[in-house]
């Protein structure tokens, strides 16, 4: 545990396996079959409950088929909750170019503040590709009523903690019955997940 550069250096040069708690660049994917009411509550909790923790939402991925029905009310709810929202061009067009555009660096940034990047994706596979490219293997979640789609997400996302219809902030040792934690191990070898 420590700064990003310290953790990476220790992991790179250690002669023994070390447990690393690195960044928590957490994602939520809103599927076209998501329940809007639940999605708004989950997303606001995931971003705004405690913005500076490693389990806070940093990137929101929304299926392109539900941008108007789900994306617009979710983004408006985030903004009214005090969150700064950065979006891709497709979403900004819906908002008549009134929101700030996300840059490439935003997809790989752990803000630890009331700020979130929002991107439209064409499918669960597109969401998984984005998470694979930019994620930190910490905590990622899908919001969907379609269990088949959720199963694809949960089986393919390479995260220490994968969730379905739950806030990424529900990712501490206490919630899993492990007691207090030192960090979330994103290593592929055990232990993985909350470590106390």
Feature locations, PLM:
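Active-site phosphate-binding strand-loop segment of PLP-dependent enzymes
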Residues: 1-2
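Short Gly/charged-rich anion-binding patches and loops
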Residues: 5-6, 73, 126, 149
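ALDH superfamily catalytic-core signature
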Residues: 7-113, 164
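Conserved C-terminal structural/oligomerization subdomain of aldehyde/semialdehyde dehydrogenase
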Residues: 103-196
